[in-house]
Amino acid sequence: MAKLTKRMRVIREKVDGTKLYEINDAVALLKELATAKFVESVDVAVNLGIDPRKSDQNVRGATVLPHGTGRDVRVAVFTQGANAEAAKAAGAELVGMDDLAEQIKAGEMNFDVVIASPDAMRVVGMLGQILGPRGLMPNPKTGTVTPNVAEAVKNAKAGQVRYRNDKNGIIHTTIGKVDFTPVQLKENLEALISALKKAKPAVAKGVYVKKVSISTTMGAGVAIDQATLETAN
């Protein structure tokens, strides 16, 4: 068995894996234990009461966090004409059509989000094997295939997070950085949970949001008492 580092021993001693933490206590604990030499992200795992084997129970979408994610997001947009000018004005770093596709085929992937107008999907569709495995393929469900590319760019820059359940029915995403205030992290988490509740599949039965845990990049997960969150039902 691998020997625990001193840091991991401290984390294990401090975090009670059997306890549900009040949100403010959980954030305070994460901040106390975030001793890495960089500003760690605060990540969230949400266990959903869905059957991920059934396509009509999969949960996928996007929402803009009120306080952003703390990341500088570089955006590439496939579009043309007036939409191209609008995308540039909204702050997109890369805008194009076939020329942008050629850059990507050549391995130039200096972006975090890809957005496309519907008329550009004939070009983007040929990049599926490159963009798909990286989670970058535009999709209407996440608002990244849209006629209003300028709004999509602004959302991406404002701190939009995309979510999609994994094969175990768990959503993994980020809600900010450990140097955010407790209020910012709480409100970002509440916004995410509210969005997930709105995206609940009609056929899902029983308890929908089963467990919510937050952690830092290098830390352990802390389970949240959902009663301490203010979310839309």
Swiss-Prot record:
GO terms for cellular component: cytosolic large ribosomal subunit. The keyword Kinase does not apply. The keyword Ribonucleoprotein applies. Keywords: Repressor, Ribonucleoprotein, Ribosomal protein, RNA-binding, rRNA-binding, Translation regulation, tRNA-binding. GO terms for biological process: regulation of translation; translation. GO terms for molecular function: rRNA binding; structural constituent of ribosome; tRNA binding. InterPro entries: Ribosom_uL1_bac-type, Ribosomal_uL1, Ribosomal_uL1-like, Ribosomal_uL1/biogenesis, Ribosomal_uL1_3-a/b-sand, Ribosomal_uL1_CS. Pfam families: Ribosomal_L1 (PF00687). Belongs to the universal ribosomal protein uL1 family. Part of the 50S ribosomal subunit. Binds directly to 23S rRNA. The L1 stalk is quite mobile in the ribosome, and is involved in E site tRNA release. This is Large ribosomal subunit protein uL1. It comes from Shewanella sp. (strain MR-4). The gene is rplA.
